[in-house]
Amino acid sequence: MATLLLSASVLTAWGQEAEATDGGQTEMAPTTSFTVWANEMQTIARNNTTLKAMYQQLKANQLANAADNALPDPEAEVAYMFGSPKGVEPRTNVTVTQQLDWGVLTGRRRKLSLAANTAAVAEYRVAYQAVMAEADAALVQMVYYNRLCSELENRCREARDIMQMFEKKYNDGDANLIELNKVKLNTSMSEAELQRAKADRAALAQTLQRLNGGTPLAMPHTTYPATTTLPPLATLKEALPHTAGVAQAEASLEQSTAAVKLAKVEGMPQFTVGFQGEYIKDNNYSGPSIGLTIPLWGNTRRKVKAARATQVASQLSLVAARQQQQSTLNQLYFQATQLNATAQQLKTHLDATTNDTLLRRSLEAGQLSVLNYLLEQSFYYSARTALLEAERDAQLAVSQVRALMY
């Protein structure tokens, strides 16, 4: 099995797998290196219960694949037969036989075992990719909710300040009850929105805890990683042959090819060698024996035909996997590029047209009514929320591109 390692220029690395071959068995240590969310992703990769179960299943499959790499056990038979009628001497027959498996003798069965090990590793990697992709997206969402909660906390503080200001004005006779009720309602709505965002963040924290094997995962970040900029599309395309989906299809083709070669070898007449002895009083007969199967009914031809059909299906699956990965990458890359541009454009416009300080001053100076202030403030807050969502969507799109490379 080739070591699976993606270039460091491709957002994230699959990592190096330690291999040791012993009688056709390959062991893999699921160690991984990341360039994004390094600490969190390594912790999840180490603690995730699904990956632990899949890794144990991988080792079980490797042991099972190596179980048929030796010749079948020899057979021994001893028969003691009494003479009849009375006076006939008893006879003892001894038979020892060994079946010769051409698949074992030619090494074809061992090669199939190694190919099956590679396929098992590829299956594990597909499961690994799915877990890491889910974790990556969940971490992006957690940053979004941290940013959203921080934004909503600022809005709540602003709403409370305005409410306190109007309570004072109301007590001084400078504001009426309608205006006071409006700012109180605005404060209640701000607090409710914050509590809803915190509830969503708590639910997402449970998802991260599940991915982390039941252990809570601290994720206080409010900024996205600086390494989430998309690399050139050509660089990503160079890494496509190493992705989990393509690797699994290639391993399946390798396994089916090895199965065809084994089926051809097993089509040869199967030999059995041994020793036979017949022992009677004063008369002993013994010597070597040999037997063979006669491929008369066409079972072997049907097995070879079936193996070839599986091989053709694997070839088509590999072509489909490569095309699918290529199409998926192009689609996700275009989507990520467009969403990044949209988020950046919105941020630029919002930074250039910020009116929050001016609105507060106008309200305090009495140049703006409470209703107009709340409407203008709501419009500005909607734009801020749209920016947070646009940045999140852009980061999720980059996360999907990154997930292809796990």
Regions found by a protein language model. Give the residues of each.
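Bacterial Sec-pathway N-terminal export signals of envelope proteins
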Residues: A13-E75, Y80, L100, R108, ...
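Short, charged, amphipathic alpha-helical segments
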Residues: K111-L114, L177-N186, V370-S378
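Amphipathic alpha-helical coiled-coil segments
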Residues: M41, A53-D68, A127, V131-N154, ...
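Acidic, low-complexity, intrinsically disordered peripheral segments
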Residues: M1-S7, A13-P30, A38, P216, ...
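Outer-membrane beta-barrel domain signature
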Residues: G87-V88, T92, A192-Q195, A199, ...
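Periplasmic alpha-helical coiled-coil/stalk elements that build and connect Gram-negative outer-membrane
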Residues: D22, A130-H242, L332-Q335, L339, ...
